[in-house]
Every structure is written in C-alpha cells, then in structure tokens.
C-alpha cells in the first residue's frame, strides 16, 4: 500500500526462545489509536496458534497488520494481513477477523490447496480457528455459542461449484 501510515512494531518470541520476529502494524494516522486497541491481542494469538498448529510458519520473516482503503473486508497475504478501515473501531468488535486472517498463515499460506475446489480447507480451518480463540479467551460455553451462531447456511450448497460462487457459508463453515 502507498500512503501516509503510522507504524509500530512488537516482538514475538518463539516458544523455545530460539527465534524472534517483528510484528509490524501499519495504520492511517487517524485510526492508530483504534488499531492499537483492536489489534492488541495479535502477539497472544500468534502464541496461541503456534501452540495449537506448530510454530508460526514464517518465524524467520515477520507478521504484520495493515489498514487499507476498503470500506470493509480483510485479506491475508503471506506474512501480512490487511483490513478495511471500517473494521477498526477501537472496541475489539472485529477481533474474529484478525484471528481468521492470522490463521491463514498456517492454512492457506504455509499450506495451500492445489486448486480452488479445495478452498474450503483454507477457509474452514481459519473459521474453526476463530472458535478456538473464543474458547481460549471466554471458555467452552462461548465456543459452543459461536459455533451455533456461525452455523447459518451450513450444508446449503456445494463446497465447490465451478459455475457458481465459491466463497459462501459452506466454504467458510
């Protein structure tokens, strides 16, 4: 992205303390304070998922979060995730999106499906990771509530239809 950004950096230490990496954050200046609140758990998320799925796959590089000009939405890229500026509110409302995009570092970037027909693996594991984070933070009851809430539209379509829309609820859930 090109533009005027504020940047700050934290340091993640691997569980064996043999490696460290920068975790870099880039925001538009007017969203920095909100982003610091909304993204405050990123290091803990990396630690949590490293415990669940194995060490962060790009430990020799970095991880980052960047704000960009979309009205909504988010996208992970290898070693950095981007979020639309309207998802940074300063109240943690969209933490599940931060979790989801981070989980793609393991499921989608370190390991990728051979074709689009298997995109459900990326999205399904990233969505499941949201539930795991909720369980870690809030307990089993909230974990189950979240899974039930996310059950909308499940099994109401094919996982892959080359003629149709492949990013629906069946793929993500």
Residue ranges and their predicted role:
Residues 123-173:
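Acidic/His/Gly-enriched intrinsically disordered linker/tail segments
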Residues 55-64, 114-117, 140-144:
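Surface-exposed patches in mature extracellular/periplasmic domains of secreted proteins
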Residues 29-31, 111-112, 168-173:
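Flexible glycine/proline-enriched surface loops and loop-helix/loop-strand junctions
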Residues 17-22, 74-75, 100-105, 155-171:
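Active-site-adjacent bridging/hinge elements
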Residues 50-54, 107-108, 130-138:
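Sec-exported extracytoplasmic/periplasmic mature domains
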Residues 38-39, 115-123, 173:
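Active-site metal-coordination segments of metallo-dependent hydrolases
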Residues 102-119, 132:
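Catalytic Zn2+-binding segment of zinc metalloproteases
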Residues 1-99, 128:
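Hydrophobic helix-coil surface modules that form long, contiguous segments used
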């Amino acid at each position: 992205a090109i533009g005027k950004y504020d940047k700050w950096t934290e340091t993640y230490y691997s569980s064996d303390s043999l490696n460290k990496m920068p975790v870099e954050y880039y925001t538009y200046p007017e969203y920095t304070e909100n982003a610091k609140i909304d993204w405050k758990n990123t290091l803990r998320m990396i630690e949590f998922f490293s415990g669940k799925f194995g060490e962060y796959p790009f430990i020799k590089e970095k991880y980052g979060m960047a704000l960009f000009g979309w009205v909504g939405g988010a996208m992970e890229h290898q070693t950095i995730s981007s979020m639309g500026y309207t998802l940074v509110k300063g109240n943690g409302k969209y933490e599940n999106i931060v979790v989801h995009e981070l989980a793609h570092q393991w499921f989608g970037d370190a390991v990728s499906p051979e074709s689009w027909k298997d995109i459900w693996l990326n999205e399904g594991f990233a969505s499941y990771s949201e539930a795991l984070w909720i369980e870690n933070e809030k307990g089993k009851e909230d974990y189950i509530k979240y899974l039930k809430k996310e059950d909308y539209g499940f099994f109401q379509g094919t996982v892959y239809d080359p003629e149709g829309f492949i990013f629906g609820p069946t793929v993500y859930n």
